[in-house]
Each structure stands twice: as C-alpha cells, then as structure tokens.
Amino acid sequence: MASRMGFEPGFLVLESGYGDDSDAALRQDIIHVTGSQFISGHVQEVVDAVLLWWRDDDGDLVDALVDVLAYLTDGGPIWVLTPKVGRRNHVEPSDIQDAAPTAGLSQTSTLSVAADWSATRLVARKASKR
C-alpha cells in the first residue's frame, strides 16, 4: 500500500496524530518502503510527505494541516488518515473537503488503506497564473 500511496525509498515522513488505534501494518509498510523511521514531534527539517492520523474528536483540522504544511517540501503530499464509516471517531469526507482549501490545499484522491482506515491525499494548491 505504501508504494501505491507514492512513498519511495529515502523519503522522510512526518507522522502526526499517532494513537493506539493507528494501523500498525500500514505504518510498517511505509517504514519498509522508505527505509526510514517516522519523524514526529518538533521537526527541524523539511519532509517529503506527512502522515496525519485524524479522528472526529481531534480538534480543528485546518490548524493541524497548517501546522504540518510548514515542514513539507514543495509538491509533497499530506495523507489524512481517518476511521472508515461506521468506525469510532469517523470523520465525514466533507470535513476534509472544507478544511483543505482553507489550509491552502487541494484534495486529489482517497484510498482504502487498511481495514479501519481511509487515506485522503492533499497537496498544496498551485498559484494561479496571471
């Protein structure tokens, strides 16, 4: 699944929102493909991608997106991982659709990445040409 999500060897990945309910197999697959452990906490470097585990009771999604966007390389994706429909703390897709443009992001795709988790890919919007 990590390769399908666009992760490549050598990628530095910032992980935010990790919890006991996060999917261990997906995390291990990403670590295996990239060859690197996740970066978390206070970041001092630019990362190639962000993995943001997000649940309905986690607070303001716009704030979380803006926070992680500061560390992301140009063109790098933010993968917002949310519990699937019917799972505890499910996030409505419209919540992501509403938050993304406010944070300066565009939604590009959504994948089923684990039994309990969906992943929505967000990227920075391109500046409009004049």
Locate predicted features.
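S-adenosyl-L-methionine-dependent methyltransferase catalytic core, i.e., the SAM/SAH-binding region
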Residues: M1-R130
